[in-house]
Design a protein with these regions (language model features):
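Short, charged surface segments at domain edges that flank catalytic/cofactor-binding sites
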Residues: 1-36
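Extended charged
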Residues: 1-9, 83, 87-163
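Short loop/turn hinge sites at secondary-structure boundaries
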Residues: 28-29, 79, 124
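Short, 15-30-residue, compositionally biased linear elements
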Residues: 30-42, 84, 95-99
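Histidine-centered nuclease catalytic patch
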Residues: 36-68, 80
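Intrinsically disordered, low-complexity peptide-like regions
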Residues: 49-51, 71, 144, 154
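Short Cys/His-centered divalent metal-binding micro-motifs
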Residues: 65-89
């Protein structure tokens, strides 16, 4: 898999769980990843597994093992470390208004609106995103609500969901 540090887990720890996941899928103990995305809720985008928890014994359900669309997984979740926090917070506000990650990728007006929200957030100014779809999550209780955004959390053992 070629993993890097994440949530206080080493590349070796991450690779080990990934290999077990691949084996579980191959023998039918774990279903292939299927939507909707567990971050943005998009039911139409292709999805993949993402782990937040690599501790032993392995857990194979949410919130340890999640199903995410490619946009959420690669462009939002993992890139939250290399961008100002306002990028992540603007994306989460978009999700909470019923937005999908694919909306930002496909719709220039939505992309501009989220960017305006981000800039307003950075300036400490009010800006309200227009609702897109009903949001079924409980704000503040989602698995992604309190993720660390600091680069140090990648290697900090305290970032682990469990020891």
């Amino acid at each position: 898999m070629g993993a890097s540090f994440y949530n206080g887990y080493s590349p070796a720890e991450r690779d080990a769980k990934y290999q077990v996941l691949v084996e579980r899928i191959a023998i039918g103990e774990q279903p292939e990843a299927a939507g909707p995305c567990m971050l943005c809720g998009d039911p139409t985008s292709p999805v993949m597994y993402h782990d937040e928890d690599y501790s032993l014994p392995y857990l194979w359900e949410s919130p340890a093992l999640l199903v995410l669309c490619g946009n959420c997984h690669k462009d939002k979740l993992h890139k939250r470390f290399g961008r100002p926090p306002s990028h992540w917070y603007a994306f989460i506000a978009h999700v909470r208004r019923g937005g999908w990650a694919s909306d930002i990728a496909k719709d220039a007006e939505i992309r501009k609106e989220v960017d305006r929200y981000r800039r307003a957030l950075e300036a400490g100014e009010p800006f309200e995103l227009r609702p897109l779809r009903p949001y079924i999550g409980v704000v503040g209780e989602e698995w992604f609500a309190n993720l660390r955004l600091d680069e140090a959390s990648k290697t900090d053992p305290a970032a682990r969901p469990r020891p």
